[in-house]
Amino acid sequence: MQYALGVVGPHGAVVGIDRDPLPQPIPGARFLRGDIYATTDAELLGELKAFDVVLSDMAPDTTGVRATDQARSAALFEEALGRAERLLAPTGSFVGKIFQGPDLEKIRKRMAERFSEVKLVKPDSSRAQSIEIFLAGKGFQ
């Protein structure tokens, strides 16, 4: 949230949601503590009409069973993508974390239908053996 605030500047809005409390408040950001599945679109938007960018760093509590973890990650990603599809302004962008697995290509194709540009991104900071990657979409239509 702090990074996003630096990008949007004093005239932008940053809204975050997490199940865990923030260690300390972040001035200029609006934080909702809760589960994304139990949070309404209206609660996320607040006074805003739409978002220009939706970022999702959600990851499931891992079990160590790769197929289970990948399926849970895909479900969280699809929830975030669904929110983006409902809440993004035209030409908006979405970036979400997902574990690589059998659902990845289907989800990438879904994004390609709604965004003019879709990329797979593995951050340099991510361990080489990590299965987490990010899907980024620009130009929401």
What is the meaning of each model-derived region?
Residues 4, 80-84, 111:
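Class I S-adenosylmethionine-dependent transferase superfamily signal
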Residues 19-20, 58-59, 95-100, 123-125:
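Short strand-turn motif at the edge of the Rossmann-like AdoMet-binding core
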Residues 100-141:
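Class I S-adenosyl-L-methionine
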